[in-house]
Amino acid sequence: MSFLRRHGLSILLVTRSEYFCLRGWPLRLVWAVVVVFLGWMYPADQSFADHLVQRHNLKCSQYFPCPSALRPRVEFWIDVYGRWTTKDAILHDAQRPHRVFKIIKGKACGIKSNTSYIKEQKRQIRLKLERIATMIERKQSITKAKDRHYLNMFPGRSPSVIRRAARNLRCQSGNKDGFRNALRRFGTYGPIVRRVLKDAGLHQDIQYLPFVESSYNPEAYSRVGAAGMWQIMPRTARTLGLELNATMDERLDPEAASWGAARYLKDSRKNLTVAARSKKPNVTDSELTPFVITSYNYGVNGMRRAIKKLGPDFLTVLNRYRTKKFRVAVKNFYAGFLAARHVAKNSGHFFGTYSKGRPLRYDTVILRSSVSIDRIRSVFGISQSRLKSLNPALTRFVWHGWREIPSGYSLRLPPRQGGWANKIAYLRSLPPEAGRGTPKRYTVRSGDTACAIASAFRVKCRDLIDMNRLGRQAVIRVGQSLQIPKRISG
């Protein structure tokens, strides 16, 4: 007997000799043989199903290609975003993520209480794979259903490949519930992103990139210092023209950050096109798109080096390029983008009915002079929480009253019937505020530390570090002038 598997269907084929052999058997006995055979091929335990990654009707485009060799990787991430939840741990091959060995329900990766259990599960899988590799080398028969399940993931049956997979076991949590929340935020911020992309002349489907970067969370921070919906690093922000100082961090503003991301992606395509044409003069935009998207994670220079070494063939780079930083997150970035694009475009299929956030609407007034947040609240009669939701670029030094909103800032206000003209005129008629917006300063002396200075002025060390952008190590130097934040009253 043999199997023909096409489009998710399993058809039992019987050879001519087997047919004549079975023809004389009682029908019940024939069906018993079939059931036993199917049970051997498809064990009932979900953790050992024939293939734990589902097939999806993935529709790509000429601009965003997904070659057949990349599709299994994309389908894995579709399941991460649209099928498995944050309480599921998926044990898989880091180099071939679609090679899923086991799904553990209720045991998310990265949770301290789950560490020992997941570690033991990985150990068992590793031992099983190593045993299978040894059995192949010794030309021993592999008859156990669970062993055959693992073996079927390696069509070439290469012991070295199997052992490599055993060394590359990785735990990936699902994110279906997180993606549902991202879709709600997408309803709020998606229109802003689409407008920016249109004005910048970029493809509209780039709107799905923040799903991968931050789950469309404009308040997201990473462990390495990236911030906002587009996860922009501080140094990159400044090169993209974003304000980043004690009063403003435009990485947290969806519109400003989207313009920054658009500038980055346009520059990336321009620079990578030059690099690619040096290797392949007739390279197409479609061929470059995976490199441009991946550069958002890995950097333009990193992608340029990969192209110069191996040429503008993305699959070749994916499989053969080797550096310390070209690892799991980078290799899966484009596939993750395609997966997020597919899940978001087919959200009804994956999530059914869900609540969508309302598009962000606001009026804007350009401040002619610096002004405190207290005065803004008083003049316009708007709560601080409402103002904060519309003006996320303003830092906590502004919200705490330590610094004024700078002149020239485009202040966003909630829409109002009849507009805000009378309130704006009143604001502009008021005299300057005294004693605000100019914190104390201190000149660093020998032996000082940031936290010792903060203690002397009875302010939080973290506030002093953040206000002066001292970085994670809080390095200061003799003669440096530091701004001292005001203390919060009460």
Question: Could you say what each language-model-derived stretch is?
Answer:
Residues 1-24:
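N-terminal secretory signal peptides that target proteins for export/translocation
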Residues 3, 19-20, 37, 42, ...:
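Aromatic (phenylalanine/tyrosine) cluster motif
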